[in-house]
Amino acid sequence: MKSTVATVKNPTGKVQADICKPFSGKVFYLDLTSKLISEKLEKDIKELGGTVEGFLSKEISYLITSKKEAKCVKTLKYVCSVPSPEPAQNTGESSTSPGNRRLPQEGNSSKKNEKSLVSRGKSLVKKAIKEQEILPKNSILSNALNWGVKILHVEEAKRYIEKKKSSLQQVKKSQPVVKSESKHPARRKVKPQKLKSPYIKVEDCSCQYRPLYLVLPQFRSFQNTTSNYLVEVDKKADVGQKLAETKQSINKTGHVQDGANNANIKLKEQKKHGYCECCLKKYDSLESHILSPQHKNYSESAYYQVVDDLISTFEFDFVDWSKYKNGRKSVGILMLTEKYKAEGQERNEASKANTFSERVSATTPLQENTLKDPYATSCSVPPTPVCNTDPMFSLPSPVGSAELCNKKYTTDNFEQLVATSVPALCLKDNLPGSLGEREMSVVYNETKQNETIDHTMERPKIGWDASNIPSNILLYVPQKVDAVAQYANVSLKGNIHCSKLTACQAALTYGKMDPAVCDNITFPKTVNHLHNKEGHRTMDQIYPTVQSDELQSLLPDYSPSGNLHRKLKTSAQTNLADDELLCRLSHKVSVPQQNDVLNVPSETLLAMFESSEDKTEFFGFAGSCVCDPCSMDDGDNRDQAHKNLLLSLFSHTTTSGSSFLGF
């Protein structure tokens, strides 16, 4: 320690370089319990150029500890350095002799002899006891003593470091100070702060001068009150619009901006930029882009023709018709109406032809009746008189029946009607144009309190297209009329006849018919004498027939001929004004034909139909040509003709696979 201090006070040429760092090249180990003291000492040692190690080794120069044993390190070194007594030196003098006893005896000589008389073993024991009491084995201090490390107490180390610092300061003061000249003057350190609006700031672009700023409590307005535009703006504006503009012009600070600045802001807000995916182009204004030729060409092209066709089928419910006053409409709507104008005319013509053809097939001199069916009212047409001036009853057009009638039926030329007649119905399923087991008929039932009248009729078979006939056709029968009167009006005497059937009626009722034969067909006019006092009357007095040879020429091979005799139950007390009608479509199930029916005589068949008291209704036979009535004056010939027709009904049927579909 003294040598080091001496070197600092009397420095040589080599040590002058290490004046600022006297602890350079020296290693320290700190054995301290206090963490604060160790951190402070470590900081001072590093400032003086020393290093601090965390592990004790032989390379450490100084050991700084806080233990009390470090204060008596010098005595420990002295004890360890005292040599042990050698017993060989006293070997010659061990034996007592009378010469030694004769030495002069003094007071001090006796004490010295006691110390010298201590044996070697006792001295080693004493030494070991002292070492164990002061320094335990394998401790930091014992290892440092054995390795030759210098041990310092904390207090001594602090005083030593303070002396080094003071000597260092004296050396720095004695040396001349060299001032470093800087190019730029030192700036004054100012803490950064955030400027609060409103403020003014002037800043140098080269950053050589500090910026100048001024924070104001209220910003002064520099805008002029006059407008920037050359053209004067109309001062007549709504009060609400002015209030909205003043609210928008108020800044966060509370001051009001001029209206000219607000106009610029509004123009910027109105410009809406976007991108058109159709044209693949950006636009600044949507309205100007829509009116551009590029966008118009794309919109008028056929890219979305399929979508336009689908939209055109929808109803225009979303159009605001209040905008189109006095019948004015947009161009697009007018184009749609022109586009589908031709289709609408065709549909109207088809529906007119359909209703006319069905009306002709069902017209008879009947009284007018009002339809109560909601579906029938939309399809009904005004009645047309045939054979007399009585009002007619119109048959409603079934669903989808517009395609069944040809436009040529609307003409009055009989030759065209016969040439374009529709295929008639037949009985066999394998023939084209037939309905098979399906048969259209009309049932007429009227119910009273005590008595019942059942009128069954055989409806004329109208020529239909079998592929287009709907399954839910509703047939209507008027009131106050007997069932047979739908096709013919007969007087009991037979001397009053109406005019001949019209061409349309004949063609629709009897299928393909020769015009020459139609001249021979006549019908009676009225049915007022149908109900007699007896209450029962057969149908043979009502149905006129055609000659047998003419009938055979008109009938095809597959359809039956002749008329069916049925019994009508009537009552004299029946009020025809209160009758109600029930109309429906009846589907008949085919019945296999029996072989024994062919052998039944005509009288038995006639008796079977006349004696039947069952209330079930017979709907007739489905054929193309049935019931060709004509006027006959002789009653006997009329009965004979009916018998022949009954036989002809079964004469055209065969037993090989054909089925009887009548009942």
From Swiss-Prot:
Modification comment: Phosphorylated.
Main subcellular location of this protein, as a coarse class: nucleus
GO molecular function: nucleic acid binding; zinc ion binding
Chain residues that bind Zn(2+): 276, 279, 289, 295
Origin superkingdom: Eukaryota
DBF4-type zinc finger locations on the chain: 269-317
Listed InterPro entries: BRCT_dom, BRCT_dom_sf, Replication_Regulatory_Kinase, Znf_DBF, Znf_DBF_sf
SUPFAM superfamilies (UniProt xref): BRCT domain (SSF52113)
Cell compartments where the protein resides: Nucleus
Annotated spans, Disordered: 84-119, 171-193
Keyword rRNA-binding: no
Domain spans labelled BRCT: 18-111, 136-161
Gene3D superfamilies attached to this UniProt entry: 2.10.50.40, DBF zinc finger
Keywords: Cell cycle, Metal-binding, Nucleus, Phosphoprotein, Repeat, Zinc, Zinc-finger
Single GO cellular component term: nucleus
Functional note: Regulatory subunit for cdc7 which activates its kinase activity thereby playing a central role in DNA replication and cell proliferation. Not required during the initiation of DNA replication in egg and during early embryonic development but is required later throughout development. The complex cdc7-dbf4a phosphorylates mcm2 subunit.
PANTHER family: ACTIVATOR OF S-PHASE KINASE-RELATED (PTHR15375), PROTEIN DBF4 HOMOLOG A (PTHR15375:SF22)
Record note on quaternary structure: Forms a complex with cdc7.
Protein's recorded name: Protein DBF4 homolog A
Organism: Xenopus tropicalis (Western clawed frog)
